[in-house]
Amino acid sequence: MSSPLASLSKTRKVPLESESVNPGRRGIRVYGNEDEVDMWNDGQDSEEKISLPSCYGGIGAPVSRQGPHDSELMASMTRKLQELEQQLQAQNDEMLSKERKILDLEDLVQTLQQHQNNAALQRQEELETQCIQLQRQIGEMERFLSDYGLQWVGEPMDQENSEEKTVSENDERDWMKAKKFWKPGDSFVPPEVDFDKLMASLQDLSELVEGEAQVTPVPGGARFRTLEPIPLKVYRNGIMMFDGPFRPFYDPSTQRCLRDILDGFFPSELQRLYPDGVPFKVSDLRNQIYPEDGLGQFPGEGRVVGRQKMRKVTDRVEETSGSRMTAEQFLNRLPKCIIRQGEVIDIRGPIRDTLQNCCPMPARIQEIIVETPALASERQRSQESPDMPMPLLSMLRIKSENGEQAFLLMMWPEDTIGDVRKLLAQARDMDSAAFEILSTFPPTVYQDDTVTLQAAGLVPNATLLLRTRRALLSNPISRPGSLP
C-alpha cells in the first residue's frame, strides 16, 4: 500500500476537454486551495463520470471515488504543516530566550572579570606598598646596625626549610609564633672569656665615669648625686652583678653583657637606670667556681669508694662582706666642687687630705681647672647679677694620657673642638697637634676642629680622654665603633 506522499508524487493526468461530454460546464481543476476543493466536493452529489480518451484505458474513474481521498490528504498535510509551524515558532521563542540568557551571562562574566581585575590590581598595589615599607624598615635597621659595627647574618635557607618540614600542619601556627622570629640567644655559643681583656675594659669604663654626678629628683627640685660603683664579681664560670643572681657565661643575656663590655660599651641592660654610664667595683674571682645549683659546699669531709678520706675543697666561694662604706665611697657622695661668688671651691680635696692620714686611699687624680672665657663670664655674672638664671654651659672633664690628671673646662655650646684643643695645649704647655681628644662611649675621635660642642654631643657635660696622636685619619669624626 502506497503512502499519501507517494501518491502525491505521481503525476495526475487530466483528460482533455471534450465539448461533446458537457459543453456547458467548465473543466474541473484538480489542484487548488482548500476552498476550491471544498466547493468541488460539495458539487459532487451525483455520481458523474468524466469521459477520458480511449488511450488512458481503464484509468479513468468516477470523481466520487478520487475526491475524498485527496481531501483527507490535503487536510492531513495542512495539520502537519500547522504543527510544524507551531514547533518552529516554539523553537524560535526558545532560541530567543536562550540568546537573551547568554547575553545576560556574558554581561555577568564581564562584570566579574572586571571586578577580579580591579581586586587583583588593588592587591598588587597593597603588596607593592607593603614591600616598599618593609624594604625601608630593613634599610633603617641595617644602617642602625652598621652604626654600631654590626651586620645582619640571618639563618641559612636550608635550615629554615628543614625546620618547616619537621613541623606538622596542626602546629604550624604555634611554630610561626615560637620559631619564626630570630632569638639572640640562638646565635651565641658559650665563649672563651678573656679575663684580662674583660678586666681592662671594666677599668676603662669605670675611669670614664669616675666621679660623675647624676641628677636625682628630690621633693621641691633636684640635686646632683654621685654614682656609686656597681659591685661585679667575675667567677670562672660566670658573673654576679649587684647582689645576684649568678649569671653563667652560657646564658644569652650574660653573653650580650660581656660583648658590650668587651666592645667598649656599658651594658645595654643598665642603660635605663644609668643612661650616662656607671662605674664598676670589680672582684676578680676567676680562680673560683660558683656553684650553679645554689647550694653551698659540703662542710665536712667527703668519702668515696676505695678511699678513706677526701681532702676538703679549698677553693671556696668567698662570702659576701657587709655593706661597709669606704673612704672613697664617702668622697664620691660629696660634690667635686661648687661655685660661690664666681670662685670654684674644691670640696673633695680637703676632705681627702683629712682622711688620708687615718685610712689608706687610692692614688688621687689631680684635677686642674682651666681658665676659659665661659668660666670668666660666669664668674662675672655671679658677682654682678647672681639672681639671673645660669645659661647653658658645657662642663668637660678631660683625663690626661696617663690618667693622673683631669682637666676641668667650662665652655659655651658654640665653642669648637679647636678651642678646647688650644686651651688644653696652653694648660699643658705643649703643642696642640701632639695629642688627640677622644671619648669611649661611644668610641669617637674628635679631629675636626671646626665642629662645635653642641654638634658633637658634648653638652651639657662629657668625660673625654687624651692620647698621643698616632696617625691622621681621613674622617674628621670617626663613627661609633671605629675607634682605632
Curated annotation (Swiss-Prot):
Name it.
UBX domain-containing protein 11
> Pfam families recorded for this chain?
SEP, UBX
* Residue ranges of domain UBX in the record: 389-466
Location of Phosphoserine modifications: 478, 482
Could you tell me the keywords of this UniProt record?
A: Coiled coil, Cytoplasm, Cytoskeleton, Phosphoprotein
Annotated function: May be involved in the reorganization of actin cytoskeleton mediated by RND1, RND2 and RND3. Promotes RHOA activation mediated by GNA12 and GNA13.
Subunit-structure text: Interacts with GNA12, GNA13, RND1, RND2 and RND3.
According to the entry, every stretch annotated as the SEP domain falls at 227-291
Q: Does the keyword Cell membrane apply?
A: no
Example of a GO cellular component annotation carried by this entry: cytoskeleton
Q: Where is this region: Disordered?
A: 1-28
Coiled coil, from the record: 69-147
**Where in or outside the cell is it found?**
Cytoplasm, Cytoskeleton
Record InterPro entries: NSFL1C_SEP_dom_sf (IPR036241), SEP_domain (IPR012989), Ubiquitin-like_domsf (IPR029071), UBX_dom (IPR001012)
